[in-house]
């Protein structure tokens, strides 16, 4: 097991040190869709970096950073998910209204996931729940006994209404 960690660590270190170091002009041929640039005007050695193109929108999130970013994002994804769920849980603890949840950018399926963990009677994901409802695998009055499902259904209706009215909020959670 330790050997596996050593190999993965070495691979990450190798990718981190060589990411973007190799000269793009020597390794890759210019495609017909690439913007022709003289070698003097290239501000970096990285291949297909968005700052080198005239369509640069200034957003660093749209920049291609290579293997290191992919590995970092894969490692940080569970932490971001936990942070979002904690934010939603804090809103629920403060008895936030539907409008406050919507203003915070909470999507209905994320609200259901957070409520589901607080309510012991809900032991399945939203997609499993909806599938069972449509297949009539348990009585319909069972659904309405769950506070989690009632809260989710109320917020989902509010969310859909706001989306239909064109009052869109950037989804942050």
UniProtKB/Swiss-Prot annotation:
Signal peptide: 1-24
Region annotation Disordered: where it falls in the sequence: 25-64
Top-level taxon of origin: Eukaryota
This protein's name: RxLR effector protein PITG_10232
Induction: Expression is induced during host plant infection.
Family membership noted in the UniProt record: Belongs to the RxLR effector family.
Compartments where found: Secreted; Host nucleus; Host cytoplasm
Comment text on domains: The RxLR-dEER motif acts to carry the protein into the host cell cytoplasm through binding to cell surface phosphatidylinositol-3-phosphate.
Purpose of the protein: Effector that leads to host programmed cell death.
Keywords: Host cytoplasm, Host nucleus, Secreted, Signal, Virulence
Residue positions of motif RxLR-dEER: 46-65
Organism: Phytophthora infestans (strain T30-4) (Potato late blight agent)
GO cellular component assignments: extracellular region; host cell cytoplasm; host cell nucleus
Biased composition (Basic and acidic residues): 37-49
